């Protein structure tokens, strides 16, 4: 009996691979269903023999309570965007300056959700969302219901792979047909449907919706030499990879490929929003390294935005957490890039004046980067004596007089007690990239603020379950979850807190760099502008903004209050002893290493106290050079920087 179960699992997984991955089924649906039912019956009779890679794991109505946070072992970086051929040529020049013989891999940019899959001994252990690149959500049970994701690899590998989870157009249409029949609101586009499906707590719904994936990266160390090799290896493991790709050292040929795909993309069975161009050599990728936000060895070309005409019906003015007042146009609805658009940003008052935008105008609307609807210009030939738009003089939230500074393009409310600003600051503090307090969204912030229960971020930590229960719509179970999420956030690493404070010019990446350098929020608050400005990737603007923020008396009081509530001020990332052998040294790795992988070398250097960077400069203290070292070695020699080899590093 056990042998028959093993045979059925093997057969059904092979047939599923032929159907979902290879698009070449060798058995009929009825034959598959017959074998599947036989397996289900055997598993019901012999549950002790159920295999971890059984296809029956992909179905069922398991209801989850929520999704836990997941710390990625290997960060997921975003990509630099390009919107023109000129930007691609500039990227090519930057790469060729370091590596004249570099070739590129051009791949389709699938319009879905980035996911990370970790296998231990060949068995899928964790499937997670990208999140902020460092911390995502564990959605393993949902990803097990995606039919082309292997539950068990043929080899007993420990591997982490990355890819895009998407909803095919055919599946999207089927879902919306069902929603229409049930009188439910339809999904606007396949990407929204995929995102909503992956966040479903009922895994049975996920199984029915026929999501799919394309894998494109091995995040864990690999012995492969090129991106092309990686894709071939991923396919050999049973993953779906996209075959619409091109390898070329010529950006002209890459551009021709882009033009062809853009013309034909409507015929693809899934949505794409551009082409990703990567340096094909993994060794060159390592050499080129990363900026604070993105790899230097890749760029994402975004297709030009679709444009439609619409009429401006009215304009709403809203104030954000920094006091900037933003105009949003209400439009006659139009279909744009697969979405119904009825609102579009007008950016700021200077933009309105420059474009002479008026209520009643017919305007050209587009999606900036295929994401945010915006007004491009006015169709003057259709203007019919519309009145000039009335620019507000008073804040729409607090009624204070608005100001328009000479060096700014926007109107600004400078009242620090403006209700909308306070609510926006509170929502930002609790948001995913900041303190990540689950359940503490804008609607809850509004209720708490209106009930006079919170007025600044420290008030969040005063809240009790009883306070939350006084709000409309909050039951005991929800109140308890929110309270525990608040308490849990106290233990976050301090870069989350720093970002949550909403300091101008200080984003999440800069927050991490600052806390890596200073280790503690209090130490950062007392640091000089010069010491902050000297950190790679930052500069004078951020340093001045931090200095201005921390010298305020009310900020010092806020930090004292947060301390009294035991909110963590320490950076919880990897720290090294100041007496480590390479403590404080900036080191660059270059060339091909023979006895250790680049990741192993980088980790060893960091454990010895070094800061490993991707480029050689006057701030570089040491370079470790392997064979075939290129321009970085030459530059280090010109600058008189100490040069060591791989054996030196091994012997440390």
UniProtKB/Swiss-Prot annotation:
Under the heading InterPro entries, the entry gives: BRCT_dom (IPR001357), BRCT_dom_sf (IPR036420), DisA/LigA_HHH (IPR041663), DNA_ligase (IPR001679), DNA_ligase_AS (IPR018239), DNA_ligase_CS (IPR033136), DNAligase_adenylation (IPR013839), DNAligase_N (IPR013840)
Binding positions for NAD(+) per the UniProt entry: 29-33, 78-79, 107, 130, 164, 278, 302
Keywords (A to Z) from UniProt: DNA damage, DNA repair, DNA replication, Ligase, Magnesium, Manganese, Metal-binding, NAD, Zinc
Where in the numbering of this chain does the BRCT domain appear? 577-652
* Cofactor dependency: Mg(2+); Mn(2+)
The disulfides recorded in the entry are none
Q: What is this enzyme's class at the first EC digit?
A: ligase
In terms of SUPFAM superfamilies, this protein maps to: BRCT domain, DNA ligase/mRNA capping enzyme, catalytic domain, Nucleic acid-binding proteins, RuvA domain 2-like
Tell me which EC number(s) this protein carries.
6.5.1.2
The record's active-site residues are 109 (n6-amp-lysine intermediate)
Q: Which SMART domains match?
A: BRCT, HhH1, LIGANc
Q: Which cellular component, as a GO term, is one annotated location? A: cytosol
- Molecular function terms, GO-annotated: DNA binding; DNA ligase (NAD+) activity; metal ion binding
Is Magnesium included in the keywords of this UniProt record?
A: yes
Task: State the family it belongs to.
Answer: Belongs to the NAD-dependent DNA ligase family. LigA subfamily.
UniProt-recorded name of the protein: DNA ligase
Q: Which organism is it from?
A: Streptococcus agalactiae serotype III (strain NEM316)
- Identify the coding gene: ligA
């Amino acid at each position: 009996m056990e042998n028959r179960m093993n045979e059925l699992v093997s057969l059904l997984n092979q047939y599923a691979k032929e159907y979902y991955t290879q698009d070449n089924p060798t058995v009929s649906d009825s034959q598959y269903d017959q074998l599947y039912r036989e397996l289900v019956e055997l598993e019901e009779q012999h549950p002790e023999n159920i295999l971890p890679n059984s296809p029956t794991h992909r179905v069922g109505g398991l209801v989850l309570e929520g999704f836990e946070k997941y710390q990625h072992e290997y960060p997921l970086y975003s990509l630099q965007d390009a919107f023109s051929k000129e930007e691609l040529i500039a990227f090519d020049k930057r790469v060729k300056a370091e590596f004249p013989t570099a070739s590129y891999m051009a791949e389709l940019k699938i319009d879905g959700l980035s996911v990370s899959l970790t296998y231990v001994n060949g068995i899928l252990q964790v499937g997670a969302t990208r999140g902020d690149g460092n911390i995502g959500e564990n959605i393993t049970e949902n990803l097990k219901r995606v039919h082309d994701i292997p539950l068990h690899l043929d080899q007993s590998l420990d591997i982490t792979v990355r890819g895009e989870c998407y909803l095919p157009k055919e599946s999207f249409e089927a879902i919306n047909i069902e929603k229409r029949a049930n009188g439910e609101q339809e999904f606007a586009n396949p990407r929204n449907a995929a995102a909503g499906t992956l966040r479903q707590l009922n895994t049975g719904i996920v199984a029915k919706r026929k999501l799919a994936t394309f894998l494109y990266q091995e995040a864990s160390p690999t012995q492969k030499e090129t991106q092309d090799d990686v894709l071939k290896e991923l396919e050999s493991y049973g993953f779906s990879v996209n075959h619409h790709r091109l390898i070329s050292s010529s950006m002209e040929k890459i551009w021709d490929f882009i033009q062809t795909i853009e013309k034909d993309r409507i015929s693809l069975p899934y949505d794409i929003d551009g082409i990703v161009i990567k340096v094909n050599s993994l060794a060159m990728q390592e050499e080129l390294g990363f900026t604070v936000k993105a790899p230097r060895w890749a760029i994402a070309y975004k297709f030009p935005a679709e444009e439609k005409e619409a009429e401006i019906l009215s304009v709403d003015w809203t104030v954000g957490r920094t006091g900037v007042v933003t105009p949003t146009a209400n439009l006659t609805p139009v279909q744009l890039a697969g979405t119904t658009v009825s609102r579009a940003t007008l950016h700021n008052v200077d933009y309105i004046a420059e474009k002479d935008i008026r209520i009643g105008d017919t305007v050209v609307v587009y999606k900036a980067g295929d994401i945010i609807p915006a007004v491009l210009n006015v169709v003057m030939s259709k203007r019919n004596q519309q009145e000039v738009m009335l620019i507000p003089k008073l804040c729409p939230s607090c009624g204070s007089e608005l100001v328009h500074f000479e060096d700014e393009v926007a109107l600004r409310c400078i009242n620090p007690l403006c209700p909308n600003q306070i609510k926006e600051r509170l929502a930002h503090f609790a948001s995913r990239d900041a303190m990540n307090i689950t359940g503490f969204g804008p609607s809850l912030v509004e209720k708490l603020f209106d009930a006079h229960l919170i007025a600044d971020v420290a008030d969040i930590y005063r809240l009790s379950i009883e306070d939350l229960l006084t709000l409309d719509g909050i039951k005991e179970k929800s109140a308890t979850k929110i309270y525990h999420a608040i308490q849990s956030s106290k233990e976050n690493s301090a870069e989350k807190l720093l970002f949550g404070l909403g300091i101008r010019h200080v984003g999440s990446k800069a927050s991490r760099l600052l806390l890596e350098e200073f280790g503690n929020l209090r130490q950062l608050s007392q640091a000089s502008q010069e010491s902050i400005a000297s950190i790679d990737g930052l500069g004078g603007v951020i340093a001045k903004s931090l200095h201005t923020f921390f010298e305020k008396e009310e900020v010092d009081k806020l930090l004292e209050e947060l301390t009294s509530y035991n909110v963590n001020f320490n950076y919880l990332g990897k720290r090294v002893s100041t007496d480590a052998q390479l403590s404080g040294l900036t080191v660059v790795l270059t060339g091909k290493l023979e006895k250790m992988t680049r990741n192993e070398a980088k980790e060893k250097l960091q454990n010895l106290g070094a800061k490993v960077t991707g480029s050689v400069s006057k701030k570089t203290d040491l370079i470790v050079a392997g064979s075939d070292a290129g321009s970085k070695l030459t530059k280090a020699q010109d600058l008189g920087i100490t040069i060591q080899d791989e054996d030196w590093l091994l012997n440390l």
